[in-house]
């Protein structure tokens, strides 16, 4: 039997032995940062090992070596042209009203305040807004007829914006919850059922009234079955063939909507003794656990005439954004919702993250996942950051 060679401290292992190879390899990566003349290498910390360069044909870091080169090979870019700015409107006073759960966001007083607010982001390239009116309680009813009042707050705001900025793209919200005393997107029966087809009749009237006011894009967010096709037919019947539909295709029953409902006082209102008002919107909005269901919704919306499909919320549902991007040729919108905005604001206010970097990273992720349009309350700030402002 061959005797094992004893490793003596300071003695070089026998050439060709397994141990000689191991020791040699270890030596390659553990020698201190000293050159052959005994002097330390310059430009690296003392103690940095001297190694034999790896024989790598591909080194991905070469394409990350400088900001200029990184920019030249960047796969997606974010532009203010991608942003749609949500605006909340009220007329309870002539003053803007801060929304406590959305720092930096106000309910804008109808009139000059709205014009002034929209003018600023336009100067940075944000030329799309979506209008959300806060309806006074005395105008809310169980059947939400205020939704299609031709002189309602939403309709007047659309006219105001189009008169002031003819080239502004004005999107609207098509749903009954801002006008419904029960706080739901559809009409609620006494038994607590959201009436699908009856609701659609009023959604069609709402969409037509918005188109008559000058809306460029109507956006059904209600999640009633068949509403896109019905709205398309209603618009075409009234001569609005050029008005687009951005469907909330995959709108999830999410916990991230809380601040938005604060802004419009539009949360469900259960607890009535004689009526079973659902405490949430889970019978019509999608289950957060579901992925394949989004394909079914997308196929239906595309077949019914949607021009744009939306995923809401955004960051927790990037897989669904990618799914729609890969299964449909239609533009995909992503809603960076109020809860996502509030979380970023809260963390930034406490110094837990760099707000600018985090927001622009989020916008980039929406684009990388396949989003063409981004509805975001950061529209003004992000456009300024993209322009180089601090």
Curated annotation (Swiss-Prot):
Residues of the transit peptide: 1-24
Predominant location: plastid
Gene Ontology CC: chloroplast
A GO molecular function held by the record: metal ion binding
Chain sites annotated for binding Mg(2+): 297
CC cofactor note: Binds 2 magnesium ions per monomer. The first magnesium ion is required for catalysis. The second functions as allosteric activator.
Annotated positions binding 5-aminolevulinate 2: 338, 377
Pfam family, one: ALAD
UniProt cross-references to InterPro entries, sorted A to Z: ALAD (IPR001731), ALAD_AS (IPR030656), Aldolase_TIM (IPR013785)
Role description: Catalyzes an early step in the biosynthesis of tetrapyrroles. Binds two molecules of 5-aminolevulinate per subunit, each at a distinct site, and catalyzes their condensation to form porphobilinogen.
Name of the protein described by the UniProt record: Delta-aminolevulinic acid dehydratase, chloroplastic
Native source species: Chlamydomonas reinhardtii
């Amino acid at each position: 039997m061959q005797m094992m060679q004893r490793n003596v401290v300071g003695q070089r292992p026998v050439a060709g032995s397994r141990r000689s190879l191991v020791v040699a390899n270890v030596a390659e990566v553990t020698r201190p940062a000293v050159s052959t003349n005994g002097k330390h290498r310059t430009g690296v910390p003392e103690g940095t090992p001297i190694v034999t360069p790896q024989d790598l044909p591909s080194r991905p870091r070469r394409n990350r070596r400088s900001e200029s080169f990184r920019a030249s090979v960047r796969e997606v870019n974010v532009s203010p042209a991608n942003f749609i700015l949500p605006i909340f409107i009220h007329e309870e006073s002539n003053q803007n009203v801060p929304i406590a759960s959305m720092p930096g966001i106000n309910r804008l007083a109808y009139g000059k305040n709205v014009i002034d607010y929209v003018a600023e982001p336009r100067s940075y390239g944000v030329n799309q807004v979506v209008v959300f009116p806060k309806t006074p309680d005395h105008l809310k009813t169980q059947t939400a007829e205020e939704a299609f009042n031709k002189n309602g707050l939403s309709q007047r705001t659309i006219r105001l914006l189009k008169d002031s900025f003819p080239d502004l793209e004005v999107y609207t919200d098509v749903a009954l919850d801002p006008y419904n005393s029960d706080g739901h997107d559809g009409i609620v029966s006494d038994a607590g059922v959201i009436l699908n087809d009856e609701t659609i009749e009023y959604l069609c009237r709402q969409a037509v009234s918005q188109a008559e006011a000058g809306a460029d894009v109507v956006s059904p967010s209600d999640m009633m079955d068949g509403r896109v096709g019905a709205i398309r037919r209603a618009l075409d019947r009234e001569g609005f063939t050029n008005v687009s539909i951005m469907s909330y295709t995959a709108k999830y029953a999410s916990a991230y909507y809380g601040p938005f409902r604060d802004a419009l006082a539009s949360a469900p209102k259960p607890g009535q003794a004689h009526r079973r008002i659902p405490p949430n919107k889970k019978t019509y909005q999608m289950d957060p656990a579901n992925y394949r269901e989004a394909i079914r919704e997308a196929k239906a919306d595309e077949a019914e005439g949607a021009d744009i499909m939306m995923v809401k919320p955004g960051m927790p549902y990037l897989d669904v954004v990618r799914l729609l991007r890969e299964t449909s040729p239609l533009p995909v919108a992503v809603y960076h919702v109020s809860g996502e905005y509030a979380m970023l604001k809260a963390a930034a206010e406490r110094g837990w993250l760099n707000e600018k970097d985090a927001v622009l990273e989020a916008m980039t992720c929406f684009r990388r996942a396949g989003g063409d349009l981004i509805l975001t309350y950061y529209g003004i700030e992000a456009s300024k950051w993209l322009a180089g402002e601090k």
